[in-house]
């Protein structure tokens, strides 16, 4: 029977077995290995010559002859010894190579893990710095049982000059509104005409096609201002089908946009908790209003064109100067509670405004005193959108469960309720400039005749939730946007 040596891989002349590892070796090679290392070459346990057991096979044989150092057999013996040395060295090198490979693999894994940790820590550090930059020291002063005003160092309060400016603008707007209310515009769309509304244009390349869709809309004339999940704000001429300007700077989705009457200034509110004021002439950010500590959900421009209201998930509303970028006051809708404010809108006269919140309550606020003037608790789900009629008498509110309510601000009561069968959130509400029609954006687009509170037309052209609805001049067209990435124009 022949045995193979565990060191050389050749047939053994004098096979022995190691009591430590159980492997078979040629006695000549293993004795030399023990003399040099004192261990078993396979298990690396301590090994002596006494622990080697000879293996014998059946049959007879003669012992090898002794050779002298001057004969050819002697030379062959020397060559054999050299071969043995090479085999031992080769075996040792193979073991060292295997160990080196294992150590290298371990080091590479450690390096990869270290790189991942460094990358994660860098991201966390960047996020922490951004969060720190948004924090502002503030103290809260209790004003009354209904409201808490945040008196931060950056908030100047409503000065006498600001209040005088707002009151003067309110008086002029009230006089103009009374004059307009005597006669409706000759070109105002009729109910039967609006019933024939059809899609005349669909624009799908305004925002990123890879990140649907459009979340906010405002229009002035033939210009639309839209905000999207792609974090950008776009000024678009939908008649010429031309992008006029793209504004980039927010790092989260856009929740609300306002196009200033000057058609040059654009304002956007984002889930990154910032409000940005943009210049359409060079796409630059003229001011960043950093007053909230949570996503800004809605904004509304004062009729003076200089101030803006903002609502946030941090349970506060704020009044800010868009020229300086400074917050003038910041008020909690419910002191001691974290109630997200989903919607906010100025009354046409600019001295009162409404908020809709997650507690399903609509509140009317007096801006001068920052106090609640009235509360409407009729909804059963969070109020997602609100809109004042241009005549100043009515307020429309839409909730998460698909209900639209019309409130009389003179009698402080609910006049009408319109319930959608789909029970889907009402994302947008908008009156036309005369207050005759109300546009609703939910799972589809709907137009109601306010006086009769009846549906004039229902449009299901969008394939996703409708996030913005605006009437064109004299209600002769309707512009809408949706999470399906499209801006659509309807006319008759």
UniProtKB/Swiss-Prot annotation:
Residue intervals of the U-box domain: 1-72
Subcellular location: Nucleus; Nucleus, Nucleoplasm
Keywords in alphabetical order: Developmental protein, Differentiation, DNA damage, DNA repair, mRNA processing, mRNA splicing, Nucleus, Repeat, Spliceosome, Transferase, Ubl conjugation pathway, WD repeat
Cell membrane listed as a keyword: no
Pfam families: Prp19, U-box, WD40_Prp19
BP-aspect Gene Ontology terms: cell differentiation; DNA repair; mRNA splicing, via spliceosome; nuclear mRNA surveillance; protein K63-linked ubiquitination
PROSITE patterns on file: U_BOX, WD_REPEATS_1, WD_REPEATS_2, WD_REPEATS_REGION
WD repeats: 207-246, 249-288, 291-330, 336-375, 378-417, 461-491
Coiled-coil region: none
Keyword Transcription regulation set for record: no
Description of the deletion phenotype: Enhances sterility conferred by rnp-4 disruption. Combined with emb-4 knockdown, leads to accumulation and leakage of unspliced ama-1 and tra-2 to the cytoplasm, severe growth retardation and arrest in larval stages, and loss of interaction of rnp-4 with pre-mRNA and spliceosomal U snRNAs.
GO MF terms held by the record: ubiquitin protein ligase activity; ubiquitin-protein transferase activity
Enzyme class: transferase
Superkingdom: Eukaryota
Cellular component GO terms held in the UniProt record: cytoplasm; nucleoplasm; nucleus; Prp19 complex; U2-type catalytic step 1 spliceosome
Cystine crosslinks: none
Assembly notes: Homotetramer. Component of the NTC complex (or PRP19-associated complex) which is associated with the spliceosome.
Function text: Probable ubiquitin-protein ligase which is mainly involved pre-mRNA splicing and DNA repair. Core component of the NTC/Nineteen complex which is part of the spliceosome and participates in its assembly, its remodeling and is required for its activity. Together with emb-4, necessary for interaction of rnp-4, a probable exon junction complex component, with mRNAs and spliceosomal snRNAs. Plays a role in nuclear retention of unspliced mRNAs.
Family named by the database record: Belongs to the WD repeat PRP19 family.
UniProt-recorded name of the protein: Pre-mRNA-processing factor 19
UniProt lineage: Eukaryota, Metazoa, Ecdysozoa, Nematoda, Chromadorea
Gene: prp-19
């Amino acid at each position: 029977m022949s045995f193979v040596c565990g060191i050389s891989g050749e047939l053994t002349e004098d096979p022995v077995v190691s009591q430590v590892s159980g492997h078979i070796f040629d006695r000549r090679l293993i004795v030399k290995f023990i003399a040099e290392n004192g261990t078993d070459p396979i298990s690396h346990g301590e090994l002596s010559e006494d622990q080697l057991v000879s293996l014998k096979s059946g049959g007879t044989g003669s012992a090898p002859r002794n050779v002298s150092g001057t004969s050819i057999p002697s030379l062959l013996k020397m060559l054999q010894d050299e071969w043995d040395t090479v085999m031992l060295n080769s075996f040792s090198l193979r073991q060292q190579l295997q160990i080196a490979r294992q150590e290298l693999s371990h080091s590479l894994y450690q390096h990869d893990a270290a790189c991942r940790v460094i990358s994660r820590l860098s991201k966390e550090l960047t996020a922490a710095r951004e969060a720190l930059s948004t924090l502002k020291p503030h103290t809260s002063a209790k004003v009354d049982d209904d409201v808490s005003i945040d008196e931060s160092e950056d908030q100047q309060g409503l000065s006498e000059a600001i209040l005088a400016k707002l009151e003067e603008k309110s008086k002029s707007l009230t006089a103009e509104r009374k004059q307009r209310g005597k006669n409706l515009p000759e070109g105002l769309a009729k109910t039967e005409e609006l019933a024939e509304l059809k899609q005349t244009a669909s624009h799908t390349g305004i925002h990123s096609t890879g990140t649907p869709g459009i979340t906010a809309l405002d229009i002035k004339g033939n210009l639309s201002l839209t905000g999207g999940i792609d974090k950008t704000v776009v000024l678009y001429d939908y008649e010429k089908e031309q992008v006029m300007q793209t504004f980039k700077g927010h790092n989260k989705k856009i929740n609300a946009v306002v196009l200033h009457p000057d058609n040059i200034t654009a304002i956007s509110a984002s889930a990154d908790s910032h409000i940005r004021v943009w210049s359409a002439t060079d796409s630059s950010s003229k001011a960043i209003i950093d007053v909230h500590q949570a996503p800004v959900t809605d904004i509304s421009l004062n009729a003076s064109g200089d101030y803006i209201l903002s609502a946030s998930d941090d349970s506060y509303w704020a009044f800010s100067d868009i020229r300086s970028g400074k917050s003038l006051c910041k008020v909690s809708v419910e002191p001691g509670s974290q109630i997200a404010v989903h919607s906010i809108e100025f009354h046409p006269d600019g001295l009162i405004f409404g908020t809709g919140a997650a507690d399903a309550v609509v509140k009317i606020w007096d801006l001068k005193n920052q106090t609640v003037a009235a509360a409407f608790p009729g909804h059963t789900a969070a109020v997602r959108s609100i809109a004042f009629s241009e005549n100043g008498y009515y307020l429309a509110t839409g909730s998460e469960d698909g209900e639209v309510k019309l409130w009389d601000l003179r009698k402080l009561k609910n006049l009408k309720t319109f319930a959608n069968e789909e029970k889907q959130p009402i994302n947008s509400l908008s009156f036309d400039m005369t207050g005759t029609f109300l546009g609703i954006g939910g799972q589809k687009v709907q137009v109601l005749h306010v006086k009769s509170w009846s549906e004039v037309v229902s449009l299901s052209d969008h394939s996703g939730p409708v996030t913005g609805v605006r009437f064109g001049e004299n209600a002769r067209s309707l512009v809408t946007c949706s999470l399906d990435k499209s801006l659509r124009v309807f006319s008759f």
